Amino acid sequence: MDWLLATPQLYSAFSSLGCLEGDTYVVNPNALAILEEINYKLTYEDQTLRTFRRAIGFGQNVRSDLIPLLENAKDDAVLESVIRILVNLTVPVECLFSVDVMYRTDVGRHTIFELNKLLYTSKEAFTEARSTKSVVEYMKHILESDPKLSPHKCDQINNCLLLLRNILHIPETHAHCVMPMMQSMPHGISMQNTILWNLFIQSIDKLLLYLMTCPQRAFWGVTMVQLIALIYKDQHVSTLQKLLSLWFEASLSESSEDNESNTSPPKQGSGDSSPMLTSDPTSDSSDNGSNGRGMGGGMREGTAATLQEVSRKGQEYQNAMARVPADKPDGSEEASDMTGNDSEQPGSPEQSQPAGESMDDGDYEDQRHRQLNEHGEEDEDEDEVEEEEYLQLGPASEPLNLTQQPADKVNNTTNPTSSAPQGCLGNEPFKPPPPLPVRASTSAHAQMQKFNESSYASHVSAVKLGQKSPHAGQLQLTKGKCCPQKRECPSSQSELSDCGYGTQVENQESISTSSNDDDGPQGKPQHQKPPCNTKPRNKPRTIMSPMDKKELRRKKLVKRSKSSLINMKGLVQHTPTDDDISNLLKEFTVDFLLKGYSYLVEELHMQLLSNAKVPIDTSHFFWLVTYFLKFAAQLELDMEHIDTILTYDVLSYLTYEGVSLCEQLELNARQEGSDLKPYLRRMHLVVTAIREFLQAIDTYNKVTHLNEDDKAHLRQLQLQISEMSDLRCLFVLLLRRFNPSIHSKQYLQDLVVTNHILLLILDSSAKLGGCQTIRLSEHITQFATLEVMHYYGILLEDFNNNGEFVNDCIFTMMHHIGGDLGQIGVLFQPIILKTYSRIWEADYELCDDWSDLIEYVIHKFMNTPPKSPLTIPTTSLTEMTKEHNQEHTVCSWSQEEMDTLYWYYVQSKKNNDIVGKIVKLFSNNGNKLKTRISIIQQLLQQDIITLLEYDDLMKFEDAEYQRTLLTTPTSATTESGIEIKECAYGKPSDDVQILLDLIIKENKAQHLLWLQRILIECCFVKLTLRSGLKVPEGDHIMEPVAYHCICKQKSIPVVQWNNEQSTTMLYQPFVLLLHKLGIQLPADAGSIFARIPDYWTPETMYGLAKKLGPLDKLNLKFDASELEDATASSPSRYHHTGPRNSLSSVSSLDVDLGDTEELALIPEVDAAVEKAHAMASTPSPSEIFAVPKTKHCNSIIRYTPDPTPPVPNWLQLVMRSKCNHRTGPSGDPSDCIGSSSTTVDDEGFGKSISAATSQAASTSMSTVNPTTTLSLNMLNTFMGSHNENSSSSGCGGTVSSLSMVALMSTGAAGGGGNTSGLEMDVDASMKSSFERLEVNGSHFSRANNLDQEYSAMVASVYEKEKELNSDNVSLASDLTRMYVSDEDDRLERTEIRVPHYH
């Protein structure tokens, strides 16, 4: 009552949706408008306290108002609105706000409690079968109303799936709410089980399978995966594996000897396996012709006696089983198949339609007959299978639309057997139990049990879909092998963290209980541990040809599919247990694998690869591959059912995600308080997904019934895996980055096992030939480090619980490292030696190889003189990898040091060498470990300096490095070490070459090859994608990391896979080389790995790769001739990487500017000219433009080495016009050219003269190069258009302008050889020429200027050029595009634009 008084409007709104009149719920005609209002209030409620939905929960409006409306509304719009509101109300609490933050206050905790109560009561309301049935029927109605679903209808279906997903996601662990029916039950009833049971009764499985395969599946693909994951949420994978193993065993025994299977299983296995077997009557009429001659009459009697006790559906099931054997005594499989069909069809309508039953069953039968008539007699079985499964979707008036699409789609891609077992949903597993207790005689009971077991077995066999029988026995044999590649491996998955190898032993024991010949001696010779249960079965089955066997199983699968006619309607009131749900899901698993799995994985994979804005949790994809691929391999389904999963593309994506998640995990681990659980879970799922992928390849390699296409596909896949260096290196990376403090031991075990399986595949693929094989010994060398072996030792510590296979993986690696590679020293670690001693003392059963290894290592250790303690790994190795320790010991920053750094920076800011001063200050205070680069990176990380300043400081480091490398007694180096005149002359990229020479000199050339390979691979991927090919030509593959980064338009990481590469990233010359080449360092990108910019073109990457050293043309994956031509035609793009190119650019950092007020604005123009020059012209040897310290110029995209389009040529016309019109006697045209082609630098302009000067006198007017035009523009800019006192005599002018011309003429006459000798004169002349520069508020003005006539002439020529070439813009705007000025500098001084020719 209090609630009603507090929220009368809310109560009024919900109560007016409808009311109960007698037994009928009447919907208010205005219900839709009320629902829209409720939805609006729900959407715009308080985003923190969520008061509206809390009020709904308090008023129990979900149960009292929304659910009745959902069950009784007939209007589609009302149903849609109700479902949308329910979806909103059942959203998990975590999606509404930050639970961690809300838990900190009492109000927040109370809010969370009330919202959880709302969710729990909502889930409780959906335990009623009518509520879920309304949602399922609504989906069926939408699908049947129109085969071509509109986007709106697709959205409606997605909302229904979202509602089911939200309901199943709600946890049941809250103690404050208990279902009333749960209190009276001894063990309690799971609401989850009840909802799942109801959904499967309502044929949700068929609906889901249809939605997975229909053309519009992209709309709900992600939601579907989430729903499937929640359906399997509480199902331990080992449970389903055991059930499928039993099923598989029964299948093998029945298909080999029918008579034997009638008697053997009950004798040997009824005690252990009958509960599961007898609850699984998946075959109503599949085996009766061959099995049931002797018991047909007894079954008829028994069935007749119980007609009143079982449901109508149960009657139909029993009668079908009893009738068919009598009708068909010849035992022919084909005959029983057809007869089973024919006898069921007339029987179903008569006996399966009770008065109170919903009409969809009767409609279903009518539709089925219509379908059969329409399809005709041809391929009757196959068509029926498809039709039956999809016709059950609902009481449609247009069933053809619903069934036609998927049937055609499936039949086009798979053979008829693939359409199989829609119907054996675990609905049937529970049919036999009801009649059994009321049977009169125990013998009849036993007969029924036997029959159920044998018939159950027959349909299991069908799932194998044409597998050749001889191999089936081999599959079971190899399960117990200690060879890692066989079936034993799945037991080491993440879900079995406490089971390990033991689970497989359990499986084998349960398998043996239902096998026919446990005592057969043939099983023991080869394999010691598990008995070879199935070996004897190979002999009888080999009598049939493989094709006959395949056909037999196809028939059985068709029949199994038809058993879906007997649904779970008779068990509506059944109370489901966990075992019931497990059996249910076992059946659905087979249907899902046969019908929807490949579609769902393919759809999700496509959405993950697309650059869609919708974020998708990748863990669902990993889970799909991990969880179901093991079942597909266990049942050895035909390759056509998993051909979209076992592809290079899927494995490539998993590899890329492994690298990406490794980096994300480390970045988050460095941030205090970040939640690592999602990253750890995804990381573990990636590893297990790769393991199941490789395990499936290995399993199918041993299957004998594959056709040639499947074998070729597997062979090709193995060759691609052997070429994929990223995959094999991924496990080196993950093992090195293993951290016991955050990772679980199960994750470590999965890493070791998966790596072992991969190595076996690599070893076997080397024998296939056809590709360049890798050298396994070189690869294994990467594991021969102290820390990796330390982690192997951690795993070996638990050798008693690991299981034989995991121990086998560990010992194999140690054997290779200690024996083949001879690096036994890395095994001399306490954790390994102690474990060896324990194994030795415990007499643990080991094969001879491992015993020899232990003995050899211990003996070698005892006889090897001890080394220094530093070589023994300490516990610090377990905290992080070696390079991480190095980084943190050498460059770790305490909070005090970080605070001190800013103070030191302020103190050093006016010093020429800022970083050197900071290093000195740290050193004075006792900290001698700070390197120059680490200080620069820390300055950037703390935002003390901008990216532009960081860029210039790094250039300064380049110069420092070059100075220390090249200092000679004759070189006049300044205090800051910036003397580049001699060394840079004639060598524009000299700094890169110097770094390369030093790296090679230090014997680190292999790291240059590593970097070169990455660049070449990126180049190859870009070329392939540019050509529009998804698959590269030839046998080459695109490496996963480069391919996916480029596809997603992300920068490509330079992954340091092994220890050597990580150490190289701490080697200063290599880091400087990366910086010089334009590769983003980790500090730049805020990441663990350095990165190659994604905007680089293939030509750029190829040019940089050539810089690193000669290319091995034989190993290139592409034709380099085009790229060779491109690099040869435009060398400048590889010699100039913007403002970071040359070491000489750093000379501006320590220049002492004389009169900054007088020259403040000149560097603006110079920086622009420098930028345009660097980007647009081919430089001559000494064209080195310096960057002034007062203006840190930088492009908007840092590091871009691409050339810009050439500068517009209108200035050439200006020069021609000027020379043609001049009347004064001031020299010949070469004067003008000389004056315009000279590049002069004073302070901000650098200290070199353009080489064009020496050629200017002989350059004709028609061959003016871009440098000339740029330089002329520079001078015109200085001299302005508002020159008042200049004469009109051509290049002649006033004293100032003539002094400039004279200066430049001198430079022209001096020639290139005297360039350096002119510098002092140039400096003096330039300074005097600018001494009279005055700044006012509007423009530059001089005492002596050019005349206005010249200005007007220039403007007119400019206008003509503008008319002639409309796309050319002014040079000013062109330079503006190429040059981005620094915002900070603009604020520091008043910027006065130079007027341009107006």
Curated annotation (Swiss-Prot):
GO terms for cellular component: cytoplasm; cytosol; nucleoplasm; nucleus; perinuclear region of cytoplasm; replication fork protection complex. Required for the production of circadian rhythms. The biological cycle depends on the rhythmic formation and nuclear localization of the TIM-PER complex. Light induces the degradation of TIM, which promotes elimination of PER. Nuclear activity of the heterodimer coordinatively regulates PER and TIM transcription through a negative feedback loop. Behaves as a negative element in circadian transcriptional loop. Does not appear to bind DNA, suggesting indirect transcriptional inhibition. Residues 338-355, 400-421, 440-452, 504-515 have a biased composition (Polar residues). Residues 273-290, 522-531 have a biased composition (Low complexity). Residues 291-300 have a biased composition (Gly residues). It is found in: Nucleus; Cytoplasm, Perinuclear region. Its main location: nucleus. Keywords: Biological rhythms, Cytoplasm, Nucleus, Phosphoprotein, Repeat. Expressed in head, photoreceptors, lateral neurons and glial cells in the lamina and medulla of the optic lobes. Expression follows a light-dark cycle, levels show a significant decrease at the end of the night and then remain low throughout the light period (at protein level). It comes from the Eukaryota. GO terms for molecular function: DNA binding. Forms a heterodimer with period (PER); the complex then translocates into the nucleus. This is Protein timeless. Residues 376-390 have a biased composition (Acidic residues). It comes from Drosophila melanogaster (Fruit fly). Disruption phenotype: Mutant flies show loss of both behavioral circadian rhythms and molecular oscillations of per RNA and protein.
